[in-house]
A protein has these predicted regions:
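Hydrophobic alpha-helical connector segments
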Residues: 66-94, 144
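Generic hydrophobic, amphipathic alpha-helix propensity
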Residues: 3-11, 28, 53-57, 61, ...
Length: 189
């Protein structure tokens, strides 16, 4: 592992443990066993390190999504993708919060854009089957993202207790019922 890779790995660990608000380059340097000039040589600034860490976090998120076994059924695939998205936030809430904060600031992160394209592809597959229950694929993708993000935020803000699984499932089911028309039953002749 190169010094740069080690600094990135330690930065991600620090973000997962403490969150972005408590992020400290001094702590990252100490944990990585390097001096501050080494960090600045590789990343230029604390924000440069944070930006690189967010890019790496989104890369890991995207790799997790790409590695998942996805059902050939579009609705099931959308459910799986939704569960994976929310699961990432549940597993890594502080890191997820930092990632979304970057997106909300308008930072362009190619892996985040590619993850959105995966969602768009899942919605397009539902539309291709004639099962889209909304006026457009864009509206359906926006709804899926917004409700998955809301469920993910329940994990991020869970200071005292984890969110009730029933609430997470209800959010997902609402999104799926709105996005997908019910399956047509085949008539026996």
């Amino acid at each position: 592992m190169t010094t740069r890779e080690k600094l990135l790995a330690v930065a991600l660990q620090a973000l997962e443990k403490e969150g972005e608000a408590q992020f400290s380059t001094r702590a990252v340097c100490a944990l990585a066993g390097v001096s501050a000039p080494t960090l600045y040589h590789h990343f230029g600034s604390a924000d440069g390190l944070l930006s690189a860490a967010m890019t790496e976090a989104f890369r890991q998120f995207l790799e997790r999504k790409k590695a998942a076994v996805i059902s050939p059924d579009p609705e099931t695939a959308l459910r799986q993708g939704w569960d994976d998205y929310v699961g990432f936030a549940a597993d890594r809430p502080r890191l997820y919060a930092a990632m979304i904060a970057r997106v909300m600031l308008g930072v362009r992160i190619p892996a985040a854009e590619e993850a959105r394209q995966l969602l768009n592809h899942q919605i397009a597959a539902i539309a291709a089957e004639g099962r889209l229950g909304m006026s457009s694929s864009d509206a359906a993708a926006d709804l899926a993202w917004a409700i998955a993000h809301a469920a993910a935020l329940l994990h991020v803000t869970a200071v005292d207790r984890k969110p009730e699984p029933e609430v997470i499932a209800a959010l997902r089911d609402y999104a799926l019922q709105t996005i997908c028309k019910p399956r047509q039953k085949k008539l026996l002749t």
